[in-house]
Amino acid sequence: MLESLYQKQLLTLASLVREIPALKAATHRAVVNNPVCGDRVIVTIEIDENIIVASAVEAKGCALCEAGAGLWMQMSANRPLSDMSLLHNDLARWLKRIADVDKPIGISRDIYAPLTPVRAIKNRHKCVLLAFSTADKFRPL
């Protein structure tokens, strides 16, 4: 089970967080914690006319937390900040295997594929969703 949970695609996604340097021109910041396991995510973004033009994530936690943060970085690029709450809800529903007819704001759910092993482990969903939960918590710097 652990082998499939920490498969190569998921670990590659997690590595994105470590490869992207801190933003020098960040305009907003959000911090969230998972009190159950101690994971912590700090997301900084640069916004121009409500569009996320750059982001960086500092994730202190498990590989699943880092993978979710890496996915957040991929999905947030050049997207309105308001879309991120919708994507948070969509990813949460996908993890829970709740089928929706509507496709979420111009993405293919194939982007979630590296996280497929996590679907079966409900108590790890919050780890994956932690970076996405920053969507409504950003404050100007």
Language model segments and positions:
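Structured beta-strand/loop patches that form or line metal/cofactor-binding pockets in enzymes
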Residues: 16, 20-55, 59
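Short, thiol/selenol-centered motifs that function as redox-active sites or metal-ligating centers
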Residues: 61-68
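Phosphate-handling active-site elements
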Residues: 53, 76-86
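Short capping/connector residues at structural and topological boundaries
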Residues: 25-28, 37, 41, 57, ...
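Alpha-helical support elements that line or immediately flank enzyme active sites
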Residues: 68-78
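C-terminal binding/interaction regions
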Residues: 1-20, 82-141
